[in-house]
Amino acid sequence: MADTTKVDVLVVGSGPAGSTAAMYAAKGGASVMMLERRSEVGTPVRCGEYMPSNGEIVKMFPNLTDEGSLFDIPSKLVCRETLGIKLVDPKEKITLLDMPGYTIDRDLFDQYLAKCAVEEGADLVTRCAFDSIDGGVAKTTEGDIEYKVIIGADGPGSRVAQSLGLNRNRNPYPAVSAQVKGDFEPYLYMFFGDIAPGAYSWIIPKDGRANVGVGCSPRFSEGKVTDYFDKFAEKRGFSEHTRVGGKYVPSEGPVSKTVSGNGMLIGDSAGQVISVNGGGIPLAMIAGRIGGTVAAANIKSSSPLEDYEVQWRRIMEKPLKTAAFNKKLADMFAFRSEWSTRFCMNVLGKRRLNKLIRCQSLFP
């Protein structure tokens, strides 16, 4: 890369949010550069690798339109279709929720989205870390990049957010995962209790293997999240697994503002994550499509970047704020002990647990 590169839209981060934004910005006619600080897109894998079906996504976000084109991924990227979710309380009582979905290999999925962005005309630069902004110029480890619009898709600790003067996520919680071999039912398992204080541990089935992991709230946990993972793996008989990878997950809903000047935040950097379960891939892609489209329109016709704020909030704000409120209720009442977790799950019952997982108000 030259000492100073000029580009219409600079996207920082090549996850689902960044790649989708880069794809739609390029599709809209803008010159686009996408930065990835690692040597390869999608690695290491640090998430649960689960996607709800298109129908379930629309149930959660009823204002979403044209979801088919956004989530139309090749069948070869689908590891396994799942039939539902089994919620397991501290005494192993199971509540089955009918919620179809599918699992993916996150590295291959991310690489596919990045390839789509490149095919639309975006430039992908790996081994390039964003540092700061100086008057419309991004300072990176590979030189300066002059841009017209910058999109921060660089996760909960977003440097882009900091550089734009926007709030970053408060109190994200750690989560770790690994892969294990075996034959598993076509259901996602979520385990609650002391095995994962303030959050849950999971088994997500794939093809002859599973993604297993643990998330913990620092407010309730008394040790490292990796220690809880080891206990969970031992309890479930996972004596052999791949290397454990981790990340931080936003847990308090979207940040108050996602546009500032000629910059915007999308995905985890904007807190666009479902607080009650940590899910974020579909939301990242929804926000990425909006952000990339709005950025291209800004370049082409000077339409305001604030259109992004308006559009994503119309689709996602209410469900995300409802999920964040439900998470606060869980922190206040359910996660105080294993007894309170069991009690609250029994009181809520299957109907309200269905609402909880789908970002809906629990009452009435």
Name each region found by the language model.
Residues 3-17:
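Beta1/beta-strand and adjacent pyrophosphate-binding region of the FAD-binding site
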Residues 46-49, 103, 200, 270-282:
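Glycine-rich phosphate/pyrophosphate-binding beta-alpha loops
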Residues 220-294, 299-300:
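FAD/FMN-dependent oxidoreductases across multiple families
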Residues 293-364:
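C-terminal helical "tail/cap" subdomain of flavin- and related membrane-associated enzymes
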